Amino acid sequence: DALPELGHACGHNLLGTGAAAAACALKADMESRGIHGTIRVYGCPAEEIMSGKIVMNDRGVFNDLDTAVTWHPFDRNRVSNDIWQAQDINNYIFHGLSAHASRSPEDGRSALDAAELMNIGVNYLREHVPGDVRMHYAYADNGQPANVVPDYARTNYFIRSSRRSRTDDASLRVDNCAKGAALMTGTSVEIELVSSCKDMK
């Protein structure tokens, strides 16, 4: 799940190799000490966006495990005491009404205006959320030339914090920014949850 154009910026290309090597080392240690048991190595796809382990857990893949070990590349070798953030990834899809931007813009309802107003609202929201809340966004799709009032726009948001409750609150407030922007522009908004995960320590 490399990032588009950038590639494996945080070492995801190493995950499978490292997990397999750890399993081999653990097997050798267990055999040398006469410890019986079964070691499994799972590939966990789509970690970057879809949080693949959540889907696997929901489907019972890990139900019969006594323990699980996971790892992530870092700039030094250590046992992590970090708090891994609770995160929501959402798409905000705005639908408007297309019109010619020069001849009859008053007939249009700009989905792009709605997306921009939403993002402005979120940027003003940053001062009024706890310090560990992060709200990242990108314009994901507009697909219209500049001389057409766009009837479609999509933004993608990552909303994170160190506690699930704070992420829930921030996500609700971002949703409200989207709904308010749609109301202001006479458009509609569809909120699509891409993935969600809890904090972990």
Go through each PLM region and give its residues:
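A conserved active-site cap/scaffold subdomain adjacent to cofactor or substrate pockets
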Residues: 146-176, 189, 195, 200
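Flexible, small-residue-rich helix->loop connector segments that border functional cores
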Residues: 21-36
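A common structural junction motif
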Residues: 125-126, 175-185
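Internal helix-loop-helix
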Residues: 7-8, 23
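Histidine/acidic-residue-rich, glycine-tolerant segments that coordinate divalent metal ions
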Residues: 2-7, 13-14, 32-150, 160
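Cytochrome P450 catalytic-core helices
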Residues: 16-21, 25, 56
